C-alpha cells in the first residue's frame, strides 16, 4: 500500500512537471515533490534491506535534493534579476 502511494505521488509530480510550464517556481516545486517521493521510497527500501551501503542511500538522495533546490533557487533569482520575470515563456536561452 505505501509503495503504490509513493509511486502515485511520483508520477503525479511527473505529470505536473510536464503540464506546468508557466512559472519557474512551480516547476521547482514539482521537482522537489518528485525528489521527496524518491527519498521516501529509498528510505523504505533501506528499511527492508539491512546492508550497510544501502542505509546511506537515503542520505545521499537527500543531499542531492538539497543541492538541487539551492541551485534551482539561485538560477531562478538570477533569471528574475536579468529578465525581470520568472515566467518560462520569457526565457530564451539562446540570447543569454
From Swiss-Prot:
Looking at the keywords, is Transmembrane helix present?
A: yes
UniProt keyword annotation of Membrane present: yes
What membrane topology does this protein have? Multi-pass membrane protein
Example of a GO cellular component annotation carried by this entry: mitochondrial membrane
Cysteine-cysteine disulfides = none
Among the Pfam families in the record, one is Oxidored_q2
Single GO MF annotation: NADH dehydrogenase (ubiquinone) activity
Q: Which residues form a coiled coil?
A: none
| Predominant location | mitochondrion
Q: Which GO terms describe its biological process?
A: ATP synthesis coupled electron transport
User: What does the UniProt record say this protein does?
Assistant: Core subunit of the mitochondrial membrane respiratory chain NADH dehydrogenase (Complex I) which catalyzes electron transfer from NADH through the respiratory chain, using ubiquinone as an electron acceptor. Part of the enzyme membrane arm which is embedded in the lipid bilayer and involved in proton translocation.
This chain belongs to which protein, by name?
A: NADH-ubiquinone oxidoreductase chain 4L
Annotated organism of origin: Petromyzon marinus
Q: Which gene encodes it?
A: MT-ND4L
